Amino acid sequence: GSGKTTQLPKIAMMVGRGQKGLIGHTQPRRIAATSIAKRISEEMDAEVGQVAGYKIRFKDELEPGATIKLMTDGILLAETQRDRLLKAYDTIIIDEAHERSLNIDFLLGYLREILPKRPDLKLIITSATIDSERFAKHFESVNKKPVPSINVSGRLYPVQIRYRPVQDEEENDDRTLMQAIADACDELMGAGSGDILVFLPGEREIREA
């Protein structure tokens, strides 16, 4: 990717955001919010929660002096009930907006309505696939001002697809799956140095592998 998820909050800090409120950064899933907070903290040579922390359901890793707050979009949506103008934030980053969940759609609609009341609030919407011009026009209609749109190219790597021989359906049980993974890894390890990324259908299969 382009690095937008981990670099944008740090860039926002560099240009002076996060001084009058938190830099809020939403993710569709809890595991993404926690792992990104850890990654940003690592890059900034700090403990999780000191500069960048996270808040998810039942867990809050954010110290009083922190600047960047990772959270699920559901957490930010819940905060609108007690902080209707989101005054705790001076910058909000809505990441992965293309997922178009109910929470994200509600948030985008809500933020559009409060922006005229919060001219100091900066809203950043990021995605790998959304129609940026359409989103820009949607928010331009609020303040009657041009909304900047930035396209950043990601990195593409060559991919070679190879298939292992098809197995008999009668043999297609969990042990066969594990054996197929082991065989594929053996073949790849014999082809030279590199990393192996395995996709499996469920959590149980991942843990067993």
Locate the predicted segments by residue.
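P-loop NTPase motor module signature
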Residues: 1-209
